[in-house]
Regions:
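A generic alpha-helix structural signal
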Residues: 57, 61, 65, 133, ...
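Short amphipathic C-terminal alpha-helix that caps PH/PH-like domains
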Residues: 22-25, 129, 173-177
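Anion-coordinating catalytic cores for phosphoryl-, nucleotidyl-, and glycosidic chemistry
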Residues: 12, 142, 180-182
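Acidic, low-complexity intrinsically disordered tails
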Residues: 1, 158, 170-193
Length: 193
């Protein structure tokens, strides 16, 4: 599935920069702060592209912030952006996750993963979000856990129903440990995500 073209599609940008900028502006908006990119991000945007880049990142951030989907979680008392989780797996492995946005109540955890991609490939991120759900369940047993992809360009939430059991995650960890790794991965140890 192809989403509508964006003015940033033709800009020469470092990979992932636009999505990171959208996430940063969403985080600012959720915290009630004015939309401003951190200097570290703003400095990576080519000089002639800054106005277009920032306008489009703001537009997509507002799409989420103003959405009925986001407002549907206003009653949940706890919220965190860019939440890091590390949970232990058998055999000394660990599952490391960085959740874009998490809402939590006494009964439920809702994970939201933002995507600014132009193309949606069905199932492409299902295992990633299934692993996030497993990590949340391990850290908060008994709570209902749901996970959603939020396609910023389409203003659409998509619930990911796939589950990943502990054995599947352990199999992935074993495979990752056996496969080729770069120097940074060797220093950090096995990682699934």
């Amino acid at each position: 599935e192809e989403f509508a073209a964006s003015p940033v599609d033709n800009l020469e940008l470092p990979e992932g920069l636009f999505g990171t900028a959208c996430h940063a502006l969403i985080e600012e908006g959720l915290a009630g702060r004015p939309f401003a990119l951190p200097d570290a991000l703003a400095g990576q945007v080519p000089e002639g592209a800054k106005e277009t880049f920032l306008a489009e990142a703001r537009r997509l951030a507002l799409t989420f912030l103003d959405s009925a989907f986001r407002k549907g979680f206003d009653s949940m008392p706890r919220r965190a952006s860019e939440k890091g989780l590390i949970v232990g797996l058998p055999e000394g492995y660990a599952l490391s996750c960085r959740l874009d946005l998490v809402f939590e109540s006494e009964e439920e955890i809702v994970v939201v993963d933002f995507k600014s991609n132009r193309t949606r490939v069905p199932g492409e991120y299902d295992l990633q979000l299934a692993a996030y759900k497993t990590a949340c369940r391990m850290l908060a047993p008994g709570k209902r856990v749901r996970a959603f992809l939020y396609w910023l360009r389409a203003d659409r939430a998509e619930e990911v129903l796939r589950e990943a059991g502990l054995e599947e995650l352990l199999d992935l960890a074993r495979a990752a440990a056996l496969g080729p790794q770069d120097e940074a991965a060797e220093e950090e140890g096995p990682s699934l995500l």
